[in-house]
Amino acid sequence: MDVLEMFDVNYESPILESFDSTTQSLNDVHVFMSRIQMSAYDADGEGRIEYRNLKLYEISSGIFISTDRLDTGASGVEDDHEMVDYYSSARLTREFLGESLDSQKSDYFEGIKKVFSFYKNKCNESRYIKEFFEEIQFRNICGFPKQAGTSSTDIFDQFNSVDVLLQDPVTSVWNKKVGSKKANIVIIPPATNLPITEACATAGFQPEGFPKLGSGSFFTVQFDPFFSTRFKAHETDDVALLDPTLTLLHEMTHGLHFQKGIANPVNRSGETPAWATTWGRVTGDNDAFKETPMEELLTFNKHTIDDDIEISDHLKSTYIGFLYNGRNEDDPTESVDGVYQNVSSFLNQYRGFEISSDFQHFIESCYGVKYNQESKKFIVNPRNIKRYVQDGFFIDEAKFARILNIKTRSYYTLMPDNLGVWSYRVDILNRLRETFDEDRGLLSQELDFHTALTPVVSENPALELEVAGMQRMVSLPKIKASYLPSDIKIKNFTGQKISHDTILDTNISGIIISKIKYKSDFVVDESMPRSSLNTTNYNLSPIKGTKFETDIRDKTSVKVTVSEITAPMINHVMKLDNSKVLTERPSLNEDLEETFKNTKDVYIPKTTAMMKLKEGADQTLGAVGFAVWSGQILEDLYNLAQKKEVSIDQIKDDLMSILPFYCAYKNLSAEKYEQAFANATLDAFLIFATDGGGFAGLGITVGAIAINSMYAKAETMEAYDSMFGKYVDQYQNDIKNFTLNAYVQWENNILSRLWNESRLAITGFRNMLKTVKTVMEFDATNQAYSEEDRKIIKAKCEEIFSEFPMLMQTFAKNSMTANLENASKIFNDIVWQKIKEELDQYVIDSKKYFLDSLEEAYNNGSISAESYYKYQTEAREKFVSPREVIDLYIAAHDTVVKRKRYIRRYSRKYDLATDFKGNTVHLNGLGEGTQDIQDLYGNYSVYADKKTVSTQEGHFDQTIKIAKDTNTINKVVLAVSSNNGKEYALNKDEQYTISFWLRMPVPSSSEERRIFSYSAVSGVNKEVEELILQVKNNEFVLATANLLRNSEFVIEPRIALNRWVKITIVNENTRIKVYQNDNLLGLIKDSSRKKPIAQRGTFKFYNYNVDYQLDDISYYNGTISQRDIKYTFKEDHGQFVYDHWGERLQYNKAYYLLSDDNKSAFETVYETKRLKLKSVPGVDIKYLGMNDRVYGYYGGLQFKLVPLDSKNMNNYVRWGDKFTMQSIETTNLSLAIIQDNAYFAPTQLKLISNEGKSEEEIFTFDRNIKLQNAAILVGTGNSKQGPISAYKRGYSGDLWINGARLDGYVTVVNKSNYSNDEIQEKFKWIFVPKDANWVE
């Protein structure tokens, strides 16, 4: 019988009512009644054993479905121990009622069949899933030893079965047994509404608690195909969903473990083994009768999840995160020891027993142990246990569909051949939310979870490399065979077996790889000849469904050529022998070049040839060839980057991907790796530059990166095969052009050999310098290097540079065995000259690149003109050696970073905030005394004395004096003083810039209204207004009014009205520029009459005759370029806070937090652009980030920030709005004020007669009363007036709150006629919009 051969049954299929063994076979019976033994609970929680009849549907051999719900107290899960008769149960998987029960059972049945049909299809596509169900259906190996005291050492190996029952015709009781059927998995509806709660709801781990049907034991899975698990994460996290097919697969894996006796804390004799409690001690779970975390770890691979998401061990095992969490973080040693002890204790149960080869392989795959046939026991290696603790226990994926680990925190998981996990991103979640029942999170029946959702597709990686000293797997997926290292030297491998999932100790091209795990079954092809060094070439090819074992004994080394990986990554195989060698870069034909060129976002390295050394060399097809290859790839990548074909981020990511291999090469710790990987700055550079020889290892990973990138960018596998095939075919054709004679001739050419190996070192040195570029020019942290950092970088570069000649000498000595003197002479006279020529050319190229980069940095405003000319001159004069190249890179990098920080932090010498109500000007951030500030313009002191303000007839001015301290060279002193303060003579070249944010309403008249002016002293005590900004004739006017009255002009385009704009005025001696935001508006020139500031300059902002708003006044002691203006505008604009409608908040203005229903409001005051809102009791104000709207939170609800005087508030009722009272048609009145989650703090309510003659205090409330969740506040009369019932019916008048009359609808209800709930339902809010009409 085939795996998962589906029987023709449906929900309506009739139950077996009669059976004649002479004419019928139970093999043809698939729907029948059986009896189940199960645990149940009394009302007081006492347990007992019950037998219940159950209708079973066999959908495939050994796999049964029941549509009747069994309540077992959730099978040991902590839950309500509620007795439910499964015959009358209306709670199948959801709370269904009455007549819908049968239809819902039918849906459940069809849903289960649909899941298994899905599995059936996957069995045709994947041998992993097929073998899994082969284990489930046909390989029933019970792993429990017999009970203590028995003489037999056999392992139970029997089929589990269920009884087939008929109904007694007299008593109508189903008790007549006619036979048994094999049963391995029985799927039943969940015992509660949630099929997965704090643990797997699958029943089977209590000695007397698992169900039995007939003889043997099977596994019961409680499962609902219409349910997807939802994680209870934080409110800011995504809601991850697991596909039901994965959930069922997970539970069936438990069943497989149960059959094999794996990770079961209770043995067949009912005793709890010591290892179960040992594991509990390690994990903090001492309940041996509960499913242990180790069992969950074995069910699927890593049970990792973020530490801040608290979910059960079960969900951890089905959710795959990006960190490992398989050990005790506080005491890793305890974890290793604990796991070693409990695994050893568990496996000792089988000591001395005869076990089958299948069961042996099962145990070895689960625990990484070996079985000794002579002693009949499992050998546990602590080293393997340590690896399992670090990486999480895993099952052989060929048997149990092991989930692959992922690298990022992106809330999706991968599984072989597309089975099982669909975790949806936010945009998909938003589209699906309408299909979920809000209360129970159930998928609607309309959603077909097999077809409606798109799963994440991933190809199986060809092999995994676990780097020595690392605590994570480094996968190299999707690599073609010809780009894998063709030769793998296997050390210390004598006498071991190669089988699937064999772990080999290897050394590949100078990079220490501690383990290689092949992900496919391979067969050994011994047809390839052996070499003179007793090295056997094995061609490993995956054969689907084929298992093999072969011994490799007494071999000094084994050469493994990977020719095929996994389908469809085959057909491209490159084989080299000693008669064929490639000595230069293969030439690509024009068509192929064009293909690469036109491929969008794909970069293919045009590598130099991989050179093969002479036969028997230690480095086979490895170090030298790959090193040259890697160097060329890096060079190509940078060339492509300069052409904008590859982004700098891509290159940086690729470089960072190499770090794990360098950590392994240098035997660095995992902590060092994590630090370097995270920072990607100085540590990254130091790892790259550790030693010159280290560059030999670049080839493997750089090649893998390039191929991975090409694969990832190819839209289809066919496109990838086509693209790659053309390249490989051309490559192989070029190889065929080389003969053995050509190879020998090349081999004998000492100069060529020396030169090629010298180029290797040159390439490495170039790569080192380019790494310096990457680190310093594209530094993600945007921080300048410290002096110590610069010393380290420079010292390391010089160290490598100084070792360069010695490195060349070493290559020369290693390349020749005779006549070292002659070799040295050849090296010094010929090779070294070529090296210097190469370096000279590189300096020339680098200088050009540096100058081009400098020009670009200056044009985009990253560096100032001073720095640009400085480093341009230095580059032209000093750019003569790589050392000085490095010096300039460091200097330029620091300049760029410092310039940005200067603009951001230091350019604003005065930050003025205004409050026109008090007619004051404040200097923010400056106290008395001197503060030193260093920037690109030199060293300055900023001095602020006591602040002085002068007010003159309705306006004020703030005098800013600029003076030069003649006692200090290159220093300028800025002083704030009164008009009568001391005057200083200034240098003739003094310039200035002033900027401010302005909001001007639409002018209501044509009269002149001055906003801003600047005055200079022309003569003795005579001020001349040199610049005026004013509103005139409904337009903004910029003028030099008194100096040149006829030079007034209208700014075009006009300054925007009724919204915030930034005005920047730049005084450049003979001309004045005015900018709006970052655009030039106007220019005033007067070279003959415009004078520099001679003694004193006065800036004036006017607050009369114009209703404008002013903010963030800034003064600069020099001119600001347009690039700087654009930069500061963008930065300043991002710092301001905006209200709900996008208007910028103003200083010292009152605002309301308005609820989403536009009713409840809290008054607050916005103080500064740093968003300090005045405290309101019970209100939590949150600023969500730059350019975000501001919201307040109260009682879990969100409120919008709304200005008090906003025109948008016209339709809302606020404190101070007017209301009119309606007629009251009842007596015995009480006042009900009902608010939804609002804060209410009136001191009193007053009721005024229509005539306005009396003003009586009716109700008095305590101050700051907090009303939550539609609370009701009932007023009572005071001692003077008495209760409100004293008033006559039909009374109307005005309602006042805090002295403000309310003019709108107010409802006063007779509380005696309504309950509190009715009042809440009927009258949601006492203050309503004026156009509301719901008052009865």
UniProtKB/Swiss-Prot annotation:
Residues 1-476 are annotated as: Has protease activity. Its EC number is 3.4.24.69. PROSITE patterns: ZINC_PROTEASE. The active site is at 251. Transmembrane segments: none annotated. It comes from the Bacteria. Inhibited by EDTA and 1,10-phenanthroline. It catalyses: Limited hydrolysis of proteins of the neuroexocytosis apparatus, synaptobrevins, SNAP25 or syntaxin. No detected action on small molecule substrates. Its cofactor is Zn(2+). Zn(2+) binds at residues 250, 254, 296. Belongs to the peptidase M27 family. When overexpressed the N-terminus (residues 1-476) cleaves rat synaptobrevin-2/VAMP2 between '89-Trp-|-Trp-90' in vitro. This releases the cytoplasmic domain of VAMP2 from the synaptic vesicle membrane, which would prevent the assembly of the trans-SNARE complex on the membrane and thus prevent vesicle-target membrane fusion and neurotransmitter release. There are seven antigenically distinct forms of botulinum neurotoxin: Types A, B, C, D, E, F, and G, but serologically this does not belong to any of them. This is Putative botulinum-like toxin Wo.
